[in-house]
Amino acid sequence: MKLTRAQFLKALPAAALVLAGCAAAPTAPADTDELVFDHAYPLDYATQFTADCYADGSTLLTIPDAQAKFLVRPEGAATLRTVPDGVTVLQQPVQNIYLVSTSAMDLFLHLDALDSIALSGTRAEGWYLDEAKQAMQSGRIAYAGKYSAPDYERILTAECGLAVENTMIYHTPEVKEQLERFGIPVLVERSSYESSPLARMEWIKLYGILLGKEALAEEVFTQQAQRIAPLLEQ
């Protein structure tokens, strides 16, 4: 059974899930599986994902139409003893990413996070972004096969921490299932389904949460919004 967002909050193994102040002070990781909901991460335009923040620094990313939930845990956080069904835990730092969704690369570049990507689903000559092309030509990022025919051996050897796919993966569901059987979480990117340029750009906040770069993501988004908004009003 897949949990709704509300059901997930109720299912967390906490004595009580209560709203705490948004400015709760960070605390050292405790040896506990309790998660206390703190606040919903504010999104101005995006509707294809939500983010719920917890007092220990964890964030639950939900992509409803992909039926996916990712609980991003801070580096050094205690291992949870109980995780609700349908939730994938991602422990920071999220590294050695297999990036298949080409549209996400620009957001990674804005976050100065090219070094978090180890594998690409696009060959060097297929990239329209010079930084990505150069990273592949220099060997910093390796080609690991397209979405429908990944090089599983290379992906496993690279100790891939996350595969970022686009919705084309649904044409070959067996590939997604195989990656997950190998223990590789698969995030299906849906920014292209947003209704406006600003909503698509706001996906930078999702990647900021994944990579521990929330402040930079907010800064970049604000700058881009200020630049784009006047053009949209014309």
List where the protein language model places each region.
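Extracytoplasmic substrate-binding proteins
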Residues: 96, 153, 157-234
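N-terminal export leaders
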Residues: 5-9
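Bacterial Sec-exported substrate-binding components of ABC uptake systems
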Residues: 4, 22-105, 216-234
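A short, structured surface patch at a secondary-structure boundary
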Residues: 57-156, 162-168
